[in-house]
Amino acid sequence: MEKLAALKKLPSILRPLLTSKSSYHRVPSDRPTIMDAATSEQLHGLTNRLLTEVNALVSSYSSIDCQHPFLAAACESQNDGSEARSNILSSLSEIEAIVRGPKEFLENIAIQCEMLGSIQWLGEFQILACIPLSQEVPIQDVANLSNVPEQQLAQMIGLTARCGFLIEPRRGYVAHTPLSASFVTNPSHLDAAMFLAEQAAPAALKSATATQRFTESHTNNETAFSLATTTKVPFEAAQEQSPRLSRQWAAYLHHAGGLPEDHVLADAMAKLHWSNISKAGGQVVEVGAFLAAKPLARLFPQLRFLVQLPAGASSCESILCDPSDPIKPGQISIANRVPGSPQSVTNAAVYVLHLPSSVPSQILTELQVHLPALRMSNGVMLIMSGRVLPGQDEPIRARHAAVAHARGLIMYQMSNEVEMDLSSLLQMLDTVRDSTGKLVLVHKLRSCSGMTVAVVVKYQLMAGGAS
């Protein structure tokens, strides 16, 4: 309720900016100057958009009586406001980029640097778990329980509380905010933060040294990560040796890597005409992951699914054994397939391909081995492009693009892998051909944010070709 009250105040804070006749902009000299007309118009447009987005979020929270116990779950599930929140943050980022100067830019870097260090410190000493989820507690008690200096803990809280992570309800006391509490109730949030603090940030700060020392190297054990960790073990091998690192990396990709969430993928895929395939009792082959088969099987009982996973991938059998699930017995089958091996199923209506990595050569191999199957089946293939960087012409907001490019940099600093962008993927598709035909782009599936989450391709005969 406090969050809702704060949101309702935001429009009154923003309106003076819309009605102001003299807007100021900070320039590199740090001296205020009158904005040019184009920049002023852009700022007013962004502010109007932000007001609309705030009102949309307030409406989503207000549409259900969340205080009524019977409706609390519905409020949480139907009005989580994730899309509206994302839009608001994107607009705020664009406004900030216009109005901030070097001073504000550096101040923000300083805050984020110490915030990351503070959260890592709080996590290392398990302090967040020592604070009750729903009541305040003396900072001294938390310090004693965690065996850390009270003064240092108070300093950490002094910063994080100003950023909405923990709160000081009164002097000498601390309590959780919804944000900090989520790092206790959902430990993967803390795993993601610990990865950023312990692996990503140190590797990023070794990037210059890595460039100087490994100028021409493309091997996966001569990286910024290897310098930061003083090891010659490649990042992928390090994950195999350390379950903690593997868990933290997965948490980072899920929460902060800019990858589309499962429900976003499901919404985008639902736009396709699966019912046409379902009526014909068609088969769908999902390659490399088990994400699309289950939600689609619930919607279309006549569809049959084969999920092909690499040997050693975590078993999905238990997922198929839930007696309460409406999925029909035998509707989904699971088989092993080595990435890059020929596609043995040549009569599927749809192939859903999850790219094996961001390495162009591996992506090209997967596309080439599916070409004969697409030619023989006359089917289509969905290439899930969540791990592909957005192209320059993508209608995606700057904040979402920045998150994706941050992931690309982290991937490079960890393993020397360069993530492909969407334009490069489409150019690669044009090279996948045989003597009679080639792959052609049919459609792009976009999320609500404008990100392309999948491209739909098919096999097309070339002029003079014969099947």
Swiss-Prot record:
Principal location class: nucleus
GO molecular function, one term: DNA binding
The organism's place on the tree of life at top rank: Eukaryota
A Gene Ontology cellular-component term: nucleus
Subcellular location: Nucleus
Coiled-coil regions, chain positions: none
Record protein name field: Ergochrome gene cluster transcriptional coactivator CPUR_05432
Organism: Claviceps purpurea (strain 20.1)
